[in-house]
């Protein structure tokens, strides 16, 4: 969801930097790449350790939560995403959401986009779901999300969309195909596991994966 469907990765950067600045530290893009896809407690611990912040995980999360309560409701849909989601829904292709976000943060982020997210019938919130024991790059969240599809698809029949290195590795570990739409600053050689890497979701051609090319139908499921 974050950075792929919504522009919330930019909002996370603002929030994390606001906390880091209090201690004269910088939340770098390299650190951002390291934590993307992790569960809340995991990324908080990583940031605290890397920046040597004098905070507990709970203190860090509490402070950033106050910032995100203002930022997240202003989230925007990324280019090409709404077109694809509505297209797949129209052709009755099962679509799920596998986000490392908590349910509370999810609700903040989608306040202005509820109709679109209602089309994602099968949802998994990694930071709120006790079944998701480990965040990305472990495959847990994708395995749990895929199990919610009524047709119980084989892993190779599931197509994952991701923007993070951790997410790509998680999908690959789950045995799934994965299309990566990364931040333009990312070194793409760091994601050799990606089935396909695109500059934008606007560039995605569904027919390459047996999905309806805006006129055909296929049994593949997506997360």
What is each of the regions a protein language model found here?
Residues 1-33:
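Active-site neighborhood of HAD-like aspartate-dependent phosphohydrolases
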Residues 4, 99-101:
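Conserved phosphate-coupling serine/threonine residues in phosphotransfer and NTP-handling enzymes
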Residues 5, 77, 95, 160:
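Conserved SAM-binding loop
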Residues 19-20, 39-53, 109, 145-147:
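Helix-loop "lid/cap" segments that line or gate small-molecule binding pockets
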Residues 21, 89, 172:
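Anion (oxyanion) recognition and catalysis
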Residues 46-86, 91:
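Metal-dependent phosphoesterase signature
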Residues 86, 102-223:
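Asp-based, Mg2+/Mn2+-dependent phosphohydrolase catalytic module
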């Amino acid at each position: 969801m974050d950075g792929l469907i919504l522009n919330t990765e930019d909002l996370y950067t603002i929030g994390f930097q606001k906390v880091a600045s209090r201690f004269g530290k910088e939340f770098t893009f390299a650190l951002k790449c390291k934590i993307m896809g992790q569960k809340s407690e995991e990324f908080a611990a990583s940031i605290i350790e890397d920046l040597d912040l004098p905070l507990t995980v709970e203190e860090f999360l509490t402070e950033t939560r106050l910032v995100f309560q203002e930022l997240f409701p202003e989230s925007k849909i990324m280019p090409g995403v709404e077109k694809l989601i509505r297209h797949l829904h129209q052709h009755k292709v099962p679509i799920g959401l596998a986000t490392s976000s908590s349910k509370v943060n999810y609700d903040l982020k989608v306040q202005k986009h509820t109709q679109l997210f209602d089309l994602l019938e099968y949802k998994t919130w990694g930071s709120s779901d006790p079944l998701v024991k480990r965040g990305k790059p472990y495959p847990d969240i994708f395995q749990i999300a895929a199990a919610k599809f009524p047709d119980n698809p084989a892993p190779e029949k599931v197509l994952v969309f991701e923007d993070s290195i951790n997410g790509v590795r998680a999908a690959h570990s789950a045995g799934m195909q994965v299309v990566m739409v990364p931040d333009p600053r990312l070194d793409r050689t760091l994601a050799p596991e990606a089935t396909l890497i695109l500059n934008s979701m606007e560039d995605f051609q569904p027919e390459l994966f047996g999905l309806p090319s805006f006129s055909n139908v296929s049994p593949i499921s997506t997360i």
